[in-house]
Amino acid sequence: MTLQRVSPDGILDLTIIGGGPTGIFAAFQCGMNNISCRIIESMPQLGGQLSALYPEKHIYDVAGFPEVPAAGLVDSLWKQTERYGPEVILGETVISYRKLENGDFQVVTASGRTFVSRALLLAAGLGAFSPRKLPQLGNISPLEDRSVFYAVKNRADFRDKNVVIVGGGDSALDWTVGLMGVARKVTLVHRMHEFQGHGKTAREVDEAKESGAIDVHLSTEVSAIDLNGDTLQAVHLKRRDGITSRVEADRLLLLIGFKSNLGPLADWGLELVDNAVEVDGHMKTSVDGLYAAGDIASYPGKLKIIQTGLSDAAMAVRHSLTYIKPGEKIRHTFSSVKMAKEKKSEGQNA
């Protein structure tokens, strides 16, 4: 491991708020640019939503990975980054920041801990998120993570079960296909008359329906559930034309999206656009020395995918150098050259 260089006063160069793919890659870019950093992540593990909600979901649109499990992508990003030894603070939520007289930034967490750095990078995704629920089902919290789920964290939870999936977007379609051969039976319910997910996956779902591998109910909503104590037994469906039906179910998988909330970040006085932080072409916010990258950053033409977040991270770290080390000439070093030098140095010190 190449330990990061810390200034004589012990203050790190950059604090990265958020430990998802964007935040992890930002830490790697710090290492590539010879600046020290820390990641502060509110969850108990790195990876953001990929670790918390979709560890077994496969991702197909990250360059260089024809197909990769979400957890595998997080592992690869960290393996790439850990050589630089960034400080990682888990289970801490940053609630406020203050720009000090000397231009440094101090952040405060919900538990009262404070951290100081030369600059600040927001990589907090969409902020805090909570799953959308079906109000007609009332309080189903006692069933959550037992028979009602909002994400697939472990396929074994659905093995040999009668699974009803609600939703018509990418996650619902992906797991309809992904749980075939795992669940005893898969039933997909969507309130619209057509799917909103990726066309290729939608065609796979249509083909599975035609072959009898799954059941699909369009223009249909879940109206109620049957319980035996605290055990799910069945789901009641109601079509738009009023026709009702009952489907046996051991598991109800609600994949109808998440509600995001910037939380305390919304009160930081930053310029906001559509619940995201506005940045310029250098990923700088309206506050000098404070940058944003990934889903939390907004600029014209922004595409909210992992690949874009990684690019944002590289751009933000690169341009943060002008604030962290004012007056110094920024030199670009190709990764192949830098790694060759580091490996040579490691070999000499072994």
Swiss-Prot record:
Catalyzes what?
Answer: 2 reduced [2Fe-2S]-[ferredoxin] + NADP(+) + H(+) = 2 oxidized [2Fe-2S]-[ferredoxin] + NADPH
Can you tell me where the transmembrane regions are?
A: none
Q: Which InterPro entries match?
A: FAD/NAD-bd_sf, FAD/NAD-binding_dom, Fd--NADP_Rdtase_type_2, Ferredoxin-NADP_redctase_2
What keywords does the record list, in alphabetical order?
FAD, Flavoprotein, NADP, Oxidoreductase
- What EC number(s) does this enzyme carry? 1.18.1.2
What Gene3D superfamilies has UniProt attached to this entry? FAD/NAD(P)-binding domain
Q: What does the subunit section of this Swiss-Prot or TrEMBL entry state?
A: Homodimer.
Q: Where does FAD bind?
A: 22, 41, 49, 54, 94, 129, 295, 336
- This chain's protein is named Ferredoxin--NADP reductase
The record's GO molecular-function terms, alphabetically, read: ferredoxin-NADP+ reductase activity; flavin adenine dinucleotide binding; NADP binding
* Cofactor: binding details: Binds 1 FAD per subunit.
Q: What is the similarity comment for this entry?
A: Belongs to the ferredoxin--NADP reductase type 2 family.
Q: Name one Pfam family in it.
A: Pyr_redox_2
Coiled-coil residue spans: none
Query: What are the names of the required cofactors?
Result: FAD
Q: Which SUPFAM superfamilies match?
A: FAD/NAD(P)-binding domain
